[in-house]
A protein has these predicted regions:
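N-terminal leader segment of winged-helix/HTH proteins
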Residues: 1-29
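Amphipathic alpha-helical dimerization/coiled-coil segments
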Residues: 2-3, 39, 104-134
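Short loop/turn motifs at secondary-structure junctions and domain boundaries
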Residues: 16, 85-86
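N-terminal helix-turn-helix DNA-binding core of bacterial DNA-binding proteins
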Residues: 20-65, 93
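Generic structural signal for secondary-structure transition and capping sites
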Residues: 34, 46, 78, 112-115, ...
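Canonical helix-turn-helix DNA-binding module
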Residues: 52-81, 88
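Residues on one face of amphipathic alpha-helical coiled coils
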Residues: 53, 72, 102, 109-112
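Basic, amphipathic "hinge/linker" alpha-helix immediately C-terminal to the N-terminal HTH DNA-binding motif
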Residues: 86-107
Length: 134
């Protein structure tokens, strides 16, 4: 008599942990418009722009989404918000923090990668990047 022995091998599922640093960071940085908002702030004088300037420079973004993304970036200390009530209308400016400025290197790396692998290898200067400063 033959006894068949069935061995069940437990295969560990590899999933991203909820508290993984990359997972937590990607949750807000990978949202549509977030990196472009950071780039537009970087282009501003002293890395600062008013809400209306951001809205005008990001074609297609809605005021609601821009407000949400700026609030998320402010909560993460990537952007600081300054409100000047001494003028009318009230002036609200957003500025990249040191943390936000550190993200510019990541954006440069993304651009380098995209030019090499994804964007038909078109060198800068031949693309309409609206005076990109990267």
């Amino acid at each position: 008599m033959y006894i068949k022995l069935l061995i069940v091998v437990s295969i560990r599922k590899y999933t991203v942990q909820a508290n993984c640093t990359v997972n937590l960071t990607v949750q807000y940085l990978a949202k549509k418009w977030t990196l472009l908002i950071i780039l537009e702030l970087y282009k501003g004088e002293n890395y600062t722009r008013r809400f209306s300037e951001l809205k005008d420079s990001l074609e297609g973004i809605t005021p609601k989404i821009l407000s949400e993304r700026l609030k998320e970036l402010e909560d993460e200390k990537i952007v600081s918000k300054t409100i000047d009530t001494s003028s009318f209308p009230v002036k609200c400016e957003y500025t990249l923090t040191e943390s936000g400025l550190d993200l510019i290197e990541i954006i440069r790396t993304i651009k380098t990668w995209a030019l090499k692998w994804k964007i038909d290898n078109i060198p800068c200067g031949k693309q309409d990047c609206k005076d990109c400063v990267l």
